[in-house]
Amino acid sequence: MTKIVRSKYKASRRLGVSLWGDGKDAFNTRNYRPGQHGRNTMVKTSDYGLHLKAKQRIKCHYGRITEKQFRNIFGFAQKMKGNTGENFIGLLESRLDSIVYRMNIAPTIFSSRQLISHGHIKVNGKKADIASMRLKEGDVIEIKEASRQMGIIQESVSKQGQTTPDYVSFDVDSLSGKYLRVPTISDVRYPFTPEVHLVVELYSR
């Protein structure tokens, strides 16, 4: 198991949820914090601690987003019309790495970023190698022709029982899909309950 994989599973245990719904996640068998005092359930979390944990869960779910990037996305969401929390999740889900992951082109958000940065993904017929690229409704995402037989891609798209969320479409035969619309919070299939309101409160202080 690589250092990154160990680190991400440790994050699930530290934050008390399975962050990606992965069957290999150590949280499934050891649902307590790592470390000497991990099983101690008597530790009381402060109000600030609850807000911070809510933020960390969502931030970790989207992979290696820095705190600066995460806060900047929130700042942009605040300036948009409508509900800040909904805007925030909509912006996070509109990122290219999020959509490649949601389309099941990549098995994890981490491998999604890697496929993009290595030039295996195209948007509207052009190579797209920036994971944070914000997609617009109607954008077409496809796997570069020369990359379509890659083992990680073939294994991911061929998994039985997989479905895509309603805000994307994906055709397994053509290995291409479309970003249909900006999702609401309830549209996103988080493996935990996202307490977005706590993140809004934290960043609005």
From Swiss-Prot:
InterPro entries in UniProt: Ribosomal_uS4, Ribosomal_uS4_bac-type, Ribosomal_uS4_CS, Ribosomal_uS4_N, S4_RNA-bd, S4_RNA-bd_sf
Annotated ranges, domain S4 RNA-binding: 94-172
Entry-linked Gene3D superfamilies: Ribosomal Protein S4 Delta 41, Chain A, domain 1 (1.10.1050.10), RNA-binding S4 domain (3.10.290.10)
Pfam families: Ribosomal_S4, S4
Xref: PROSITE patterns: RIBOSOMAL_S4, S4
Record-linked SMART domains: Ribosomal_S4, S4
Record keywords: Ribonucleoprotein, Ribosomal protein, RNA-binding, rRNA-binding
GO molecular function per UniProt: rRNA binding; structural constituent of ribosome
GO cellular component, one term: small ribosomal subunit
BP GO annotations: ribosomal small subunit biogenesis; translation
Function text: One of the primary rRNA binding proteins, it binds directly to 16S rRNA where it nucleates assembly of the body of the 30S subunit. With S5 and S12 plays an important role in translational accuracy.
NCBIfam families: PRK05327.1 (NF003717), rpsD_bact (TIGR01017)
Assembly: Part of the 30S ribosomal subunit. Contacts protein S5. The interaction surface between S4 and S5 is involved in control of translational fidelity.
Annotated family: Belongs to the universal ribosomal protein uS4 family.
Protein name as annotated: Small ribosomal subunit protein uS4
